[in-house]
Amino acid sequence: MELLQTIAAVRNYVAAARQRGLSIGLVPTMGYLHEGHLSLARAARQQNDVVIMSIFVNPTQFGPNEDFARYPRDLERDRELAAGAGVDAVFAPAVEEMYPAGYATYVQVEGLTEVLCGASRPGHFRGVTTVVSKLFNIVQPDRAYFGQKDYQQALVIKRMVRDLNFPIEIITIPTVREADGLALSSRNKYLTPEQRRSALSLHRALHLGSDLIKAGEREAAVVRRAMEKEITAWPETRIDYVAISDADTLKPLEKIAGRVLLALAVWVGNTRLIDNVVLEVND
């Protein structure tokens, strides 16, 4: 497996693959890989001739008081895991390579980015869409792979791809979970054993909300209150949001119908975790 650290090196690598008529799949990550990332890589491996994974902790998607400095990094470990999942090349640039001095251009999707995670993390999605559009320009893949756990992010990127005419297919892969239901996240490593138990509140709340809807409850406020009650029953939890939204527009629902997104963000101690589930509600 190749390690590429400059944009020029990636362009050369991609040009050689294209000369041979090979298709390219891109798996964008911030590293500290877990089984969720590896499931993206394996899907890319099945569907493309060449798989490139980017590993870049992107400073522009972190707010001033967020965890950019302490976000876990371990490139050697990541390279081994990526190789094991069938990745052909890892692109791991320095910050200066992606954002040289005087960098001043940003990509912003409006509307979809102003709710849910966008409401509590202003500027976050601007950073995501900027770095992803840069990666798309550098790698020019046929397909790019994102996880369902970051549902809003995937939706925003699909909108960006449509609006800016990127000739790239966006593929979302189901959330990978621990045996007890906790969604895999690089940030789970911040949790103490007690907090790890409290982190189960996210999955439990989604389960509860889904069960209420399947049993016929159609008032979003009733379902949301039940989910909030489940979360706050656990120690060290603090709700950022619990939302019941249209899965395509992210607009909040009062009456539950159609493709419905149950999404939540919860602080467990000093760690912010997210999770979601999508339901088809056709009465």
Curated annotation (Swiss-Prot):
GO terms for molecular function: ATP binding; pantoate-beta-alanine ligase activity. GO terms for cellular component: cytosol. Keywords: ATP-binding, Cytoplasm, Ligase, Nucleotide-binding, Pantothenate biosynthesis. One of its GO terms (biological process) is pantothenate biosynthetic process. It is an enzyme of class 6 (ligase). Its EC number is 6.3.2.1. CDD domains: PanC. The active site is at H37. Beta-alanine binds at Q61. It catalyses: (R)-pantoate + beta-alanine + ATP = (R)-pantothenate + AMP + diphosphate + H(+). It is found in: Cytoplasm. (R)-pantoate binds at Q61, Q153. It comes from the Bacteria. ATP binds at residues 30-37, 147-150, 176, 184-187. Catalyzes the condensation of pantoate with beta-alanine in an ATP-dependent reaction via a pantoyl-adenylate intermediate. Belongs to the pantothenate synthetase family. The reaction proceeds by a bi uni uni bi ping pong mechanism. Homodimer. This is Pantothenate synthetase.
